[in-house]
């Protein structure tokens, strides 16, 4: 449904639960758009950008993060500045940018005010541009902005439809249902192989010593175990 509605030209806001394959869906969509569509796919950080660049095969899609986009545009306009000032300088100078038919935002929940200002400028130069935003407010990682993201997205998208990705490929049905109660949203777990164990700090250290770093994701308190 997501790809069908997007190819129909609709502005879309996707509320995607954890492990629902939202980024994979965006990548499939980019490969499904006609080759004459000029697509700007903005990710929140560099790691997401590199992953998307490796998986999107269509040459009509520009994949970058916000700082990378600002850097490219400023360089093209012969404007130089330090990396920390990229977005600020972009918003102040408002350099000319390329034309795009489609704007795709990944992890929209982490958009900050300066990124919102950048997006408004991009939209002002591409008023007919289709906008697709995918994210999950319950997975908001960064909290260094006063921006009301839901209100911003509603205004920025204008007339749009809202879709929900509720199927979680990471969690079992029981764990997904429990997380859904905590977050007050529907999460349908389909990974019956998911196992959660409670371990002592010593057991955790011993377990991690036997694993490959690329296979491990650690979530914990800022102060450690």
Pin down the residues of each PLM region:
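Cytochrome P450 catalytic domain signature, combining two hallmark sequence patches
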Residues: 60, 80-83
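Conserved helicase motor core of SF1/SF2 NTP-dependent helicases
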Residues: 5-57, 61, 67-72, 102-225
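P-loop/Walker-type NTP enzyme "switch/lid" segment
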Residues: 73-79
């Amino acid at each position: 449904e997501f790809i069908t509605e997007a190819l129909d030209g609709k502005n879309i806001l996707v509320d995607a639960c954890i492990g629902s394959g939202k980024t994979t869906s965006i990548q499939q969509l980019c490969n499904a758009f006609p080759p004459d569509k000029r697509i700007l796919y903005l990710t929140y950080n560099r790691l997401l950008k590199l992953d998307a660049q490796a998986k999107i095969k269509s040459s009509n899609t520009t994949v970058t993060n916000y700082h990378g986009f600002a850097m490219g545009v400023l360089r093209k306009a012969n404007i130089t500045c330090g990396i920390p000032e990229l977005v600020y300088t972009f918003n102040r100078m408002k350099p000319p940018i390329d034309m795009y038919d489609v704007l795709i935002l990944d992890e929209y929940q982490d958009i900050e005010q300066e990124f919102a200002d950048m997006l408004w400028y991009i939209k002002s130069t591409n008023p007919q541009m289709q906008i697709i935003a995918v994210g999950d407010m319950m997975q908001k990682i960064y909290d260094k902005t006063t921006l009301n993201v839901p209100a911003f997205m509603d205004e920025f998208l204008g007339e749009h439809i809202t879709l929900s990705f509720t199927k979680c490929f990471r969690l079992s049905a029981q764990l997904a249902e429990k997380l859904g109660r905590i977050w007050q949203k529907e999460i349908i777990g389909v990974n019956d192989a998911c196992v959660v164990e409670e371990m002592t700090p010593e057991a955790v250290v011993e377990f991690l010593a036997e694993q490959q770093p690329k296979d491990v994701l650690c979530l914990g308190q800022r102060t450690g175990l």
